[in-house]
Amino acid sequence: MGLDLYAYKVKNLESYNKYLSSCHNYNNYSAFLWTKYEKEVNKAYNRYCNWEAEHQNDPDYSLKENPYSYGINNFITEEEKNNENELATYREFAKTNCNYHEIESLYMRKHYWFIQYLYHKYDDKMIYRDGDIVKTFSGEQFIITKTDLKDIIDRLQRVIDASKNNLDTYYNDPLVYHSLSDEPLVNKDVMDREFPIYNEYHFAARMDWNYSYTTINSYLNDFKNVYSEMKDEELLVYVESW
């Protein structure tokens, strides 16, 4: 389970799949080049490190330039370089064509309730391997349609609606003491029902920010704003990062 989830918007599934395909082709070719020239690169890297070790105590070390370079471009042929550049150019074209851009307001940092929703949505494409949850679909990215987004909004709205009493008690009850680090929480039972834990082993240590009223309500409004401007064929793409 990643710590961060980055949200992107794309114009439709067809153009997005072409972008994924272009990324796949570029990555495969880069991996092929690395496998082919791995020994040469490692030897060059060792020469680079040896020179650094020999000269780092020289009085004029900061003025010297290491004569050795270990970049793979020093070894690939001109044809291979052109092939890689062509694949990189097509990848960037496909990215532009699908209008792949980040939606910063929907970035998630350790918001386990949302990753749980995504894991449940893709349950048939998740497997357990070596004690971890592994995605088996192309690109390892979660696709959210406009219909899915409406479902998320409805779930969050039910959580907020069920939490009004919590908010009233928090601000209006004179007998309730709050430290500076306190904040109002949503109704935990409703939150856990709308965004159930995907697997107890992976989500046993749920953090308090899963239940922050302010945070949940803020994301609800952000999702609503994105939904109101979203075309039917557009998609949200969430990328999990470690």
Q: PLM features: residue spans?
A:
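Conserved GNAT acetyl-CoA-binding A-motif
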Residues: 234-237
